Amino acid sequence: MTIAYNRGLTEVEAATSVSAVDTAKQTAITAMAAVKDNATLLADAKAAALAALDAAKAEYSQDDYATNWSVLEKAYNDGKTEINAAAAIEAVNSALQKATDAMAAVKNDATLLAEAKTAATDQLNSEYAKYKATDYTNANYELLTEKYNAGLSAIGGARTVDAVETALETAVAEMAAIKTNAQILADAKAAAKQAVNEAFAAYNEQDY
């Protein structure tokens, strides 16, 4: 503004004709009128930031965010609110960056599924590591390993987080259901005791 004003005075002073004076005057007035005040600059910054925020949100597809779309929309709407409420251009830029970062931080379904698979695989590996081959018959340990491998395959092939959790729970339960040598021995003892007891009960004390 000051530059336009001073230039206008200089050009008026340097004019050598009335028409040149009028031209210099009008040029200065037009130049000063074209200088944007703070309110206009702030409004322009807000409009640009809102447009940039809209463009950033348009890059995301709701189909990719079945789980977290509402979280992404909240980040977007919070950003709009902060931009509109900003009292300075710096605050506008900060609000835009904050909202853009917040949307980018929202995990899509593919990311959530990948994380669930990694976590489930790690947990299944930990469960399998608890079992020792020496505690089982060869056949039962082979069966346990089959259940473990089937679980890994089911987790890897799952298409939803719920399916991942189901695959993990199924594998863990099926491995746990396979009897150890100690359990087989205990079952045999219990069955034998029951058979002996039943045989003994068939005898009448009065007959002896």
Residue ranges and their predicted role:
Residues L9-T27, A33-A34, T81-A105, S153-I178:
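Charged, amphipathic alpha-helical scaffolding segments
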